[in-house]
Swiss-Prot record:
Record keywords: Cytoplasm, Nucleus, RNA-binding, Transport, tRNA processing, tRNA-binding
Name by which UniProt lists this protein: Exportin-T
CC per GO annotation: cytoplasm; nuclear matrix; nuclear pore
SUPFAM superfamilies from the UniProt entry: ARM repeat
Highest taxon, organism lineage: Eukaryota
GO biological process: tRNA processing; tRNA re-export from nucleus
Amino acid sequence: MESQILNAIEIALDGSADQKLQVQAYEFLNEVKGSKSGYDTALKLLSSSPSNTLISQLKFFLYQVLEENAENLDPEDCLQLCQTLFKMLSEFIVNDLKDEAFLRNKLAQVFAKVFTQVYISTVPDFLTNLLATTQTNSQLALDYYTRILMSIHMEIGDKYITRSPALSERNMTLKDAIRSRDMSALVTSWFNILENTNNLDEVLDNTLNIIAQYVDWMEIGLFVSPQSINTIIGYLSRENERNSTCETLIHILLKKMPAQNKLELVSLLNLTNVISSIDLSDDLEFVERIAKLANQIGEELLIVLGNQPSLLDQVNEQLLKLWPIVLTFLGHEYDDVSQSVFPFIQQFLGACKKHSQLYSVELLSTLLNKTISKMEYDEEDDDSDEETERQFAEFRARLKLFQDGIASLVPDLYIEAVPIIINQSLFEGDKPWNKLELGMFELSNFSESLKNNVINAPKAKISESKPYLMFQEFLVKLINSPFIIKVNHPLIQSSFFELVVKHYSFLNSHENRKELVFKIIEIFTSPLGLLNSNDKVRLRSWYLFFRFMKLTKPKMDNEALIEDIVLKMQPLLVIKAELPTRDEDDDVVENGNFNNQQYLFETMGLLISLIPNEYVSLKVKLVQAMFQPIFNDLEKCISIANKEPIIVLQAHHSLMALGTIVRGYDYETNLKFPPEVVEKVDNAAQVVLITLENFSKSESVRDASRFAFARFIPILNSTIISGHLTKLITIIWSAPNLKISEISDFLSFLGQIAHTYRTDENIYQLLNNFLSPLFKKVFEVLDLPVTEDESLRPDISRDKNFLKKAILNFINAIIINHLPSLLVTESNKNELATVVSKLFEYAYDISDTAVSKLAIVQLINLVNVFGQEGKISDEQDKYGQSLPPVEGIDNFLMEKVVNLSFELPFRKQEFVLGDAQYRLIAQDIALLLKTFQQKKGEQFVEYLSVYLTNMGLGQDMTNDFCSNLINLDLKDYKKYFVTFVSQMKGEK
């Protein structure tokens, strides 16, 4: 069998082997692992073969077999395995057979598994026997000894491994047994190993790790005698063991104990003196470990204070020794070292709120200065990658918390120190870019601190306070500062633009508002902003310029300035579509800058709208200047016979640009549009329709056309747009490849039309003509049977649910915009029965609770509109009163509503009121019942009473239910109904 196993291992590890053969090899090896015969074979091979004759791969596999079977053996077999392992170990030691590290680790893991099975009763002297193997002073024996103990810890003591309650209980029993039998001998052996510094570095390192692992659940007194502590601390001076020594000391500090004892432990360790004497100039990893050790000292002292405030003086004494070390690490040139002491600093500032004796102004001043200096970029960080930028931003955010914490403790210190830093960084002589950037960053922080009132000033007086006036002065000086123009650095430029956009409200209220805003616009439209050579700054500034213009809305009455802006921006408005590609993960990657470019188009629309109407000729000129290149582009796309994907994408982008320009114009005050501008938008609408006709089979062009028209709607009056909309709807609706998601979006678009033109006769007639075909198409799509392929595609199911929501929202738009008469006109009344039927169908289907809830809301709407003798009750529907009542609809709704109200919560097993979604549906059902009762009065109550009685509800309960329906207000009735359902279903 040995040869079979070896052959299977070779095949499994051979990268060039036949895949089917490899699968067979893995299956065979797994069978060996899982069978008793495989275990017997493995044990026999290991025990009978000379220790140096088995090849490594085979030996590793045999160890795996033993490990996987160890917990399933009976006591006799387990004892045999234990004896065999010790015999093998003895042979290895005697023959000084040093296997590769991975084999020694695996054997140690086998020992650990066996230990958990035999130590309690079968082999109580397991650890004694293990310790005995080290008496020869063999380095190999010590190596195995330490590895086995570390593996035992992994099995029974590692807190980061999740275990079942049974295993946790077993491990507690094992630890109790170790404490009572072997703890003292084990700890003594570890310090004996450490006292002999001639032992192998690997053995010494393992031993330090063992102490770190076991101290958590062993008697602390065994570890903290002066001699023991000196032994451990001595290893801080040994290069190969010092990192592990730091971890060991941290674990000793973490040991849970009474506050007084912990304070004594910190004093005994005297680590502040030790750390102060260590050379921290060479090894960065070691410096980081020492910093974490210092941080842990601080955290433990604060825990002592939290648990026993009476120890404040002693804790403060220790903290005063610690602070110089912490401040040194905080100011370290490497951020990873600095971050190591962040937890202590954060907790310290929190503790200072309770114990003001912990700090002095001098300490906090030093801490504040160190914090601010760490916020500064290194001067050589000239072109950091995005990940580095993100990490530094997070680093700064944590430092800012310290800054704010200090500000809340000593506001005067903060108000005095930070403005000095800002002034020195920004306005005192020539400074390198990183100093200037720090000044802008601190200026932004300063404003945030004032906004969040970390200085605890009276809220009503913040805007009049000296710090706020200082901030205003700094910001104005910054806007007018020449260095913004002179210093060509991306971080300076992006920081400036972010800062001025963030503080737009200050600019809007400033006495020199116009001058400042125009100065900023000038900088935005210079090579520092929109035309920046740095992609990141340039693209970000496109968005920020749009935000700035939208938030400040300057009055654009300077024709020369406007033309200058347009002239600068025109090269950026050239649309050049680029097809997406796929990356190495096969994800679609968008190419080109069109998404960013849309901010420029929107800004241009906004800019034109900010020109006063007395300059209407300029407005028209600029609209034409924006539109005409796009019209030319679309004409070119249409003229190309071969509609390749790149041509379709170019047409899509051009249509989106038209819509986006108009969306920007939509921000004009009070939506008053000069007729000349309306005419230009009308021209754009015609161009969109011509393009759509020529690209009607393209989903992206249909989407872009709908997008554009959605933006035209607020500007074009109904007389102009009704004909356009008729054509748009006809083209899109007749497309042969219309997707479900498109229909959903289209319904949303129609809802917008219904809202915008709800009083317009032309649009009413347009919707009236289209409603029946719309309902038929939507319900036809939703009723299509699910094919086998669709059942494997959750996106189709998701799209259908979205379509249900879309049609329900469209019905809602019709009703809330006072157009319910559309449902019962001569053209559409035949579809009403189907619509109502679908509402009940969707209400019953709680596979998507959002759909069910929305359907019930529409039923409430229908009851409100038709619930009184079928006559439309909405007085604002100007066509409703001329239409005859819908005969029988109120009684039909009454019957179906009552059925729904009790069948849905009681017959659906999954309808559990503990789930918030179902609880909301129950509340909507209560509203549905209450609405009908208010509409039909006694007639509804009588029908409901008969229904409940027929369903088997007692007369008293029926009377109580009906009485509450009549007498309770809506809020209380919702509570009552939920309680009623819960009690009847036997839910808690």
